[in-house]
Regions:
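The serine-hydrolase catalytic nucleophile loop
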Residues: 35-46
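Conserved alpha/beta-hydrolase "nucleophile elbow" surrounding the catalytic nucleophile
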Residues: 33-35, 102-103
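Conserved short acidic donor-positioning loop in nucleotide-sugar-dependent glycosyltransferases
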Residues: 266
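C-terminal capping segment of individual leucine-rich repeats
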Residues: 48-51, 254
């Protein structure tokens, strides 16, 4: 049986000190957050999954309670930098292979890892993933009205404005957590407070925004062979405003070993919006 609660740890990979939580025993299963996220976004999933797996949930570089490298985004916050952190992390634990569940920006980093180190990835689960088949649809009308934040995050003063007070940080984070959920009233005050505290850590807003800056500066793989042959299940919420379900149309081109499931009535944060359904899907797919 899983222990009562996850334990907190730190390790250093590629010169970056990463915070992570761990719970359970068995085959390793990593849960990797996106933006605006950190380890806590999986708090409804860690315990149930830990009854079946050794669950490991990091704060990635630049986020929450991990180090925030003071490097240009196109150097320190590329998909390759994050992929190398994942590789170094599993090397630290001497894992031959891992299973990974991820979404949002985490899906970008993990796709890069899957292409660089396919032999290290046993199975993959993605929620509403950004992927190459979306192309320029982010900035077509009317979707561009949902994607404005990606341009805002390019501004050098963005973190100063959002971080000018905890109240400002709360307003900004609460907007995305609510607007991207099928039920905008889902989030409790305690949950919002946890996010605000994480993003009030020195450099945390900048670290998250740097991921978007890196993407706009050529820091994400967009050419060459973008195929991922790892057995992959994609769960896509049909109420996700920022990544509409229609964008799943080209997944088979890039994931030839694909299982796609439409999650009805679920928005962008399905791990929080429908944890029981999500946990059951993960366990069913990941168990050999």
């Amino acid at each position: 049986m899983a222990t009562a609660s996850p334990s907190h740890h730190y390790t250093t990979v590629n010169g970056v000190k990463l915070h992570y939580v761990r719970q359970g025993a068995g085959e390793p299963l990593m849960l990797i957050h996106g933006w605006p996220g950190f380890w806590f976004e999986w708090h409804k999933n860690i315990g149930p999954l830990a009854e079946h797996f050794d669950v490991i949930v990091p704060d990635m570089r630049g986020f929450a309670y991990s180090d925030k490298p003071d490097l240009p985004p196109e150097v320190g916050y590329t998909d390759t930098a994050f992929a190398e952190d994942i590789r170094a992390f599993i090397d630290f634990y001497h894992f031959d292979k891992v299973r990974i569940v991820t979404h949002d920006f985490g899906a970008v980093w993990v796709q890069r890892f899957a292409r660089m180190y396919p032999e290290r990835l046993h199975k993959l689960v993605l929620f509403d993933p950004p992927y190459a088949g979306i192309g320029g649809r982010w900035f077509e009308l009317p979707q561009v009205f949902h994607s404005w934040y990606q341009i805002f995050h390019q501004q050098p003063w963005a973190e100063d404005l959002v971080g000018s007070s905890k109240e400002a940080t709360e307003i900004y984070l609460r907007h995305f957590l609510s607007a991207w959920s099928a039920n905008p009233d889902l989030w409790t005050d305690d949950e919002i407070a946890a996010y605000v505290e994480a993003y009030s850590q020195p450099g945390a807003l900048r670290g998250g925004f740097n991921c978007y800056r890196a993407a706009f500066r050529g820091g994400m793989q967009s050419s060459g062979d973008l195929t991922i042959n790892t057995p992959t299940m994609v769960l896509w919420g049909d109420s996700d405003a920022i990544l509409p379900y229609a964008w799943s149309d080209r997944l088979p081109e890039f994931f030839p070993n694909l299982t796609l499931k439409r999650m009805e009535g679920v928005g962008h944060f399905m791990m929080r919006e429908a944890p029981e359904r999500v946990n059951a899907e993960i366990i069913g797919f990941m168990k050999d």
